[in-house]
C-alpha cells in the first residue's frame, strides 16, 4: 500500500489540510520500510491523496499478478507482459502528479485503464510524499516496462524465434534495465539522514539487480549476433571485440554483487549471469580467438571499457 503521509506524530501521520463537512481519514502504510525500521501508518482525509494511493496500489496489484504468472509457458509470459504494461500505465498516470502541482487524471474510453492521452480531469493537492512523487513513479514505470520487455524476450525464446529477432529483443531489455539503473542510482544519492528521501522507499538491492540484468541481456544479444560474425574473415574481429566487452561487463556486474557491504541481488539473477558468462560468452570468445589465430589472422583493435561500466 502507498504512503500518503504528512507530518509524523508518534509513528502516525495526519493530513491537516482544510476540512469541510464530515472528516473521514483514510489510513495507509508505507509501501517500503526504511532500513531496520517499520512501515509507518499514514492517515489523510484528502480524497485527492486517496485517489493517488489507489492508483499506486492498482499498479502494485498488476505487478504482483505479473510476478506470480507461470513464466514457463507462453500464456503465462503473455499474462506477465500485459500485466507489467498495465502496471506501468498506472504508475505513469500517478507520475503526472508532482509536489505542489495538480494531478491530471486520464482514463481510456470504456476500459477504465490509465493511458498517456490528454487529460480529462484535474484534482489539486498541496503536497505529495516521496513514494507518490513523480520521481518515484518514473522509477516504477521504467522497472515495469523492463520486466514487460523481458517477458516478451522469454516468450520469443520459447517460440524459437530467429537469432536476429532475439538479439533485438534482448538489446531492448538491456537498454530498459540500464534506464532503470540510472534512475535508481540517481535517487539513491541523497542525504541518508533526511526524513523523507528516496532511500526510504526503494530497496537498494534494486540498483545492483538492474545493473546485472542489463549486463545479462547485453550478453544475450551479443552471443546471438556473434554466432554469425565469427564465421566471416571480415567480421570475426568485431565478434571478438563484442564478446570481450560483454565478458568484462558481466564480470564487472558479478564483482559488484560480491561486495560484502553491498545489498545482495536475488540468487537466480546472479546464477543467470554466471551461466551466460560461462556457457555463452566465454565459450564463444575462446572459440573465436582460436579460429582467428589459426585461420583468419584478423587484426584486433580494442579498448577496454570495463572501468567505465564499474563506475556507472
Protein language model features and the residues they cover:
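Extreme N-terminal leader/anchor segments
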Residues: 1-32
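Compositionally biased low-complexity segments, especially N-terminal hydrophobic helices
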Residues: 9-10, 116-121
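Polar low-complexity intrinsically disordered regions enriched in Ser/Thr and small residues
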Residues: 14, 113-115
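Long all-alpha helical scaffold domains
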Residues: 34-112, 121-252, 256
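Eukaryote-biased recognition of C-terminal alpha-helical segments
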Residues: 268-300
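Conserved small/polar residues in nucleotide/adenosyl-binding loops
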Residues: 302-307
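N-terminal low-complexity segments that are often proline-rich with Ser/Thr-Pro
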Residues: 309-311
